[in-house]
Amino acid sequence: MKAPVRVAVTGAAGQIGYALLFRIASGAMLGADQPVILQLLEIPDEKAQKALKGVMMELEDCAFPLLHSMIATGDPAVAFKDADVALLVGARPRGPGMERKDLLTANGQIFTVQGEAIGKYANPNVKVLVVGNPANTNAYIAMKSAMKHGRVKAKNFTAMLRLDHNRALSQLATKTGKPVASFKKVAVWGNHSPTMYPDVRFATADGAKVPELLKLGTAEGDAWNKDTFIPTVGKRGAAIIEARGLSSAASAASAAVDHIRDWWLGTNGEWVTMGIPSDGSYDIPEGIMYGFPVTCKNGEYEIVKGLEIDAFSREKMNNTLKELNEEKDAVASML
């Protein structure tokens, strides 16, 4: 049996946490032969800690062979100690009358503290995924806060755009009648927000070119892409809140499992989307936490290079970049 991997999860008793922990403990994230130690962080509030104990009781009752042990804590220093993987799920949700700037400030405080703790206490090779929204900027804050301690590199911090990627796949499958697993080379650029740009220009399905299946280049095909597909993917979260009365939790948890699994185990040359600190590719300024098409191998991700960016795509990519720059400026004083 392999040595157990330490997985820290924040917001562990929340809706996404509840949907996520059983998947991790079952082996769906790191593999069917990889034991895990769950290091679970919740706010140091009696009610939240009690709820977390209840979740842990359920995890015990599943008798997962791969669940080595669990820790519950309200202290980030304990939760991130020697963590090999960290899923930052807990975030301040947007309340009534809250401006986006207020949301950025409230979350800035949370992710500064957690980033600092990761920088001080986690395994220096920790793989960090920020799920809590606004995910890209929360990841940027955590990254900057951690890097002050000189142990954890920028590249270890990522933001979740996999849910948007999976949503794009699902919409394409519905539109074309092809199985969702047949789609390759789909990308989502930019911010995890309605400004994101799902890009199908290079996509294939069972070897067929998706732009041809969608009749891109004709008035009808281009209208579907611009007026239906892109906004549907971008606003899917809001549509789920409208239908369910709650934000998407199980699908977000599933995307988080996909993101870490692919980063950990590799993608066999397939493209996936990850929010990562830009290396300057595609004229996206270095250090901005931005969604790119990547491939993963040996625990590292690499941006898919050399893709042609047409005028429509450049406009979309710049629009989402502008929003990310505005968010970055809004939190600059906290860093």
Swiss-Prot record:
GO MF terms, alphabetically ordered: L-malate dehydrogenase (NAD+) activity
Protein encoded by which gene: mdh
Binding residues annotated for NAD(+), in chain numbering: G11, A12, A13, G14, Q15, I16, G17, N107, Q114, V131, G132, N133
GO biological process terms, semicolon-separated: malate metabolic process; tricarboxylic acid cycle
Residues at the active site: H192 (proton acceptor)
Pfam families: Ldh_1_C, Ldh_1_N
Positions contributing to substrate binding: R94, R100, N133, R167
Lineage of source species: Bacteria, Pseudomonadati, Bdellovibrionota, Bdellovibrionia, Bdellovibrionales
Family: Belongs to the LDH/MDH superfamily. MDH type 2 family.
Protein name stated in the entry: Malate dehydrogenase
UniProt xrefs under HAMAP family: Malate_dehydrog_2
Function text: Catalyzes the reversible oxidation of malate to oxaloacetate.
EC number: 1.1.1.37
Keyword Transcription belongs to the record: no
Reaction(s) catalysed by this chain's protein: (S)-malate + NAD(+) = oxaloacetate + NADH + H(+)
InterPro entries documented for this protein: L-lactate/malate_DH (IPR001557), Lactate/malate_DH_C (IPR022383), Lactate/malate_DH_N (IPR001236), Lactate_DH/Glyco_Ohase_4_C (IPR015955), Malate_DH_type2 (IPR010945), NAD(P)-bd_dom_sf (IPR036291)
Domain of life where this protein originates: Bacteria
Keywords linked to the UniProt accession: NAD, Oxidoreductase, Tricarboxylic acid cycle
